[in-house]
């Protein structure tokens, strides 16, 4: 069951990043792809955070973090190693942002960092929960 959930979540992320418009996918339920074989790879290095002042963009970036929080959880359940899950999620975040450049989307390092917030949040909660469990075990 975990494999199926993981595969489905990865598929959802890939569909979301490759479709021409995430908003179009959500609002009008249309999925369209526009492959660009020679993207401007320098766009990957853009670190413009002013876009986050737009509420819709900010909500979408929360979705980025949430997606990778969930992915990290699912990878952890599958692999059993939090470090492996976090590393796999981070590698996938990097991959998906580069992939977006080939589908006329704005893939950039800023979004990898936003994805890393979700990964780090799960990792941090995992460490806290593990520490709390260990403290409870030592207490009794």
UniProtKB/Swiss-Prot annotation:
Q: Which spans are transmembrane here?
A: 4-24, 56-76, 84-104, 109-129
Give the membrane topology.
Multi-pass membrane protein
The record's induction entry says: Expression is sigma F-dependent.
Q: Could you tell me where this protein is found in the cell? A: Cell membrane
What keywords are annotated for this sequence in UniProt? Cell membrane, Membrane, Transmembrane, Transmembrane helix
The entry's cellular-component GO terms read:
plasma membrane
Q: Pfam families from the xrefs?
A: VanZ (PF04892)
Domain of life of the native organism? Bacteria
- Would the keyword Cell membrane be found if you checked this record's keyword annotation? yes
Give the function comment from the record: May be important for peptidoglycan remodeling.
Identify this protein by name. Uncharacterized membrane protein YwnJ
Supply the source organism's classification. Bacteria, Bacillati, Bacillota, Bacilli, Bacillales
Gene name per UniProt: ywnJ
């Amino acid at each position: 069951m975990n494999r199926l959930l993981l595969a489905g979540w990865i598929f959802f992320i890939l569909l979301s990043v490759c479709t021409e418009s995430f908003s179009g996918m959500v609002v009008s339920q249309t999925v369209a792809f526009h492959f660009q074989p020679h993207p401007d790879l320098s766009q990957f290095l853009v670190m413009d955070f002013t876009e986050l002042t737009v509420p819709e963009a900010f909500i979408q970036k929360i979705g980025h973090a949430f997606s990778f929080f969930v992915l990290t959880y699912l990878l952890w359940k599958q692999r059993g190693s939090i470090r492996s899950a976090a590393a796999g999620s981070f590698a996938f975040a990097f991959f998906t942002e580069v992939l977006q450049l080939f589908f006329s989307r704005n893939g950039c390092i800023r979004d990898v960092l936003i994805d890393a917030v979700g990964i780090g949040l799960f990792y941090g909660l995992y460490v806290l929960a593990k520490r709390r469990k260990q403290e409870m075990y030592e207490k009794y």
